[in-house]
Amino acid sequence: MKTKEEFHRIEISKFTEDLREAFGYKIQYRQDLVLVNIRGCNGAGKSTVPMQMLQTDPGAFMLTLDGKDKATVFPSYGFVAMGRYFSKTGGLDGFKNNEETLKVLKLLWELPFSIIMEGVISSTIFSTYCDLFKELEQRNNPKRAVGVLNLLPPFEVCLERIKKRTPEKFDSIKKDQIEGKWRTVNRNAQKFRDAGVTSWDEDNSVIDINDTVSWFFSSIKNNLQPEFTGLRLGVRFPTEEPVKALKKAEKGVKRGKKGRKTSPVAKTLDDNGDGAFLRSLKREIRPHWDPKYLNTPDDNVRLRRDPETGQTLWDMYFINLVERQNIWYRRVIQGKSKPWTDDPVMSTYHFTNVDRRLDRVTLHYIDKVLCNLEDSYESKKFLLLNTFIYRLFVRPETTDAMGYIFPETFEEDWERAKAALRARRESGEPVFTDAYFVNDLKSANPDRANSSNKTENAIHLIQFIIDHLDELAEFTFNPKNSMEEVIEKFTMIPAVGNFNAYEVALDLGIVKEMTGIDFVDWTPDHYANVGPGCKKGIEYVFEDLGNMSHLDIVFFITSVYKGELERLGLEYKYQEGCKELDLRALEGWCCEMSKYFNYYATERGYDWAKGKRPKKKMNLRTDDVSYLNPRISNLVK
């Protein structure tokens, strides 16, 4: 976070006048503006909300009155908080008297921001603020929903927070006075409701500090302003003039031909693109990454924005990534029943897990295929064969019926497997996955006249792999060959394309992690195959890729995702044994977000929509899901 001296400062009146001039003397106001008075005793967590906004918004700046800091603007969140937050006496507690408070509030009301008011002293005052809030509720131009958020965690929690914050002073603190404030806040909460002022209570004792902002937004939406989006305006540059940045972030929606919504201009935060913002992000370069993919965005790179909200699809990518993991966490780890999300798209349509290791099919591979590996070259060679077979069908019921093919009993096992395949087809049972399209495999059948039977084509393909297994194993296990080179080698097999070759390589890349047996020298974090879905997702997020290839962007996203989650106030709930996301996870999420943005953009009639809504509906089971618990790496057991 910047020091006090590093913040941009501007007089409130000058800032307002500059805004009027920038917007043609008519400031554009959002329809979901709010004023929230956060109340609570010491240790209740009032200042945590603006403090978290301050720490996660690099575009934050100060508004002054007579040369003194009087308000903190968080443009990325669309909020301004009365007061400053560089010292313990922040918020409304830094104002001299009520007259100064009302003077600053009057000036801030003209700005296109939602407003936060919070302070310890003001938390116990009722009549003055009740009259003020009822008067503010009647104001227009702009119209703001006004409400009182009463933070009432258990009093013991408040004391524990105070003790943690100032342990050296805790014994001398007058705890009875703090308890008196807690009771006053609780009592006044009902008095506000009786007077007709929107007032609601919240217990934030179990809210992680990194979830504070998103929790705050949800609280507003659920209790004060149903239309509140909590969307960021996307103004990020701490060095950019606030008025210039805000004007770009708040540009109105134009209508193109046929009534489709288009972005005001094909530009985003800066006339020179978003390269400066992207270059400002902290990158974590992993030592095993190939430097040829570690490109740096130039000034031609542009992020796409939602024309209605100004929010970047870049931010939406990370927000939805965390929400998809939250769905998994609530369903599998917490064992909750539906609904697992409030997101209307994710609650309706199917999106795969962020981490491939959590998918049912991959878990089955770990349990039923990897368990057969022994620490010998022959066993490793036949794991390669069985992995190809598994990813050819991607249907556990099929490979379970076939059984594992061992080197010691190869002839018997292979005959049994072929018989099982033919039996499933004859009985009408599905042989191949329905999760995605598997090509007809005709090119694997040398008898083209009899290549209409896809199951027989698959048998021919497996036989080809068996016939060339020594060659494939030698190339795969040669440490001189990279993951990318091995994938290219796999595509030389008839009917095996980049996608299937990549899937096999990914499975091989987790063998050592899951078994502890040395296998190959790569992991899913060494390379990513960028397929059509991933490309489409990237082209949604980026209006212009500039000098970056799609693969460059996958590496770039992976290198900055931790910092971006922190900037957005998001927490990713890693499964046990996992400390970070790999290239495959971020590449795969680009693909999933292409489905999300297809629906999102098409439903809104945006001219950059690239497809229709997802085909597959969410149909996740709510009964026993213990089999979906993550498998723990042998390397961390």
Curated annotation (Swiss-Prot):
GO terms for molecular function: catalytic activity. The keyword Transferase does not apply. SUPFAM superfamilies: P-loop containing nucleoside triphosphate hydrolases. This is 5-hmdU DNA kinase. Phosphorylates 5-hydroxymethyluracil (5hmdU) into 5-phosphomethyl-2'-deoxyuridine (5- PmdU) on DNA as a step in the pathway leading to thymidine hypermodifications in the viral genome. The phosphate is added internally to the DNA polymer. As a final result of the pathway of hypermodification, alpha-glutamylthymidine (YdTMP) substitutes for about 20% of the thymidines in the viral DNA, the 80% left are dTMP. These modifications probably prevent degradation of viral genome by the host restriction-modification antiviral defense system. Mutants hmdl and hmd2 are heat-sensitive mutants defective in thymidine hypermodifications with accumulation of 5- PPmdU and 5hmdU, respectively. Belongs to the thymidylate kinase family. 5-hmdU DNA kinase subfamily. Keywords: Host-virus interaction, Inhibition of host innate immune response by virus, Multifunctional enzyme, Restriction-modification system evasion by virus, Viral immunoevasion. InterPro entries: HMUDK/HMUD1, HMUDK_hel, P-loop_NTPase. GO terms for biological process: symbiont-mediated evasion of host restriction-modification system; symbiont-mediated suppression of host innate immune response. The N-terminus contains the 5-hmdU DNA kinase activity. It catalyses: 5-hydroxymethyl-dUMP in DNA + ATP = 5-phosphomethyl-dUMP in DNA + ADP + H(+). Residues 249-269 are annotated as: Disordered.
